Amino acid sequence: MPAGTVCDVPTILLATDADWILEEVDASLADASTNVYRVRAGIDVLEAITQLNPDLVIIDEQIGNMGGIATCMAIRNAEGMDAIPITAVLMLLDRAHDVFQVQRCDADGYLVKPLDSLRIRKAADALLAGESYADPINLASGDAAGLAFQG
């Protein structure tokens, strides 16, 4: 059973200061079988992981005061020191060209904005199943295409 799961109810931690992202993620994932919690600052993510023990952390790349990439790196560093349990991380990117940053911070998957419920659910389901997820985009154009994630 994954770390934060109680009776197979996944816990998802969302790190964003944008209300519209909370609304999209909440509408896509929160239901009787999934709990979604939010922090507004990257600096609060490690403490929230300690308290909630989430199955998945979703991080907005442009979260204020500590960017999403730095937040993901802090998670991986804390995991490496056994300070927190290993947690799946999904990055929400502003541009397709930021995929290389996801690979550098060792995130498990990514989505490129604008978001939609189907892609959010598909990515979350993959990461909750222990898989990686790459948004099917073309780096040159930002349009949908097959792009393999090398995470």
PLM feature spans:
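CheY-like receiver
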Residues: 131-151
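Conserved acidic carboxylate
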Residues: 15-16, 93
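Two-component signal transduction core modules
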Residues: 57, 110-111
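Acidic, metal-coordinating helix/loop segments flanking the phosphotransfer/catalytic sites
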Residues: 40-56
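C-terminal output helix
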Residues: 115-124
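Alpha4 helix (beta4-alpha4-beta5 surface) of REC/receiver domains from two-component response regulators
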Residues: 70, 91-109
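Conserved phosphotransfer microenvironments
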Residues: 55, 59-77
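Two-component/phosphorelay signaling modules centered on CheY-like receiver
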Residues: 16-40
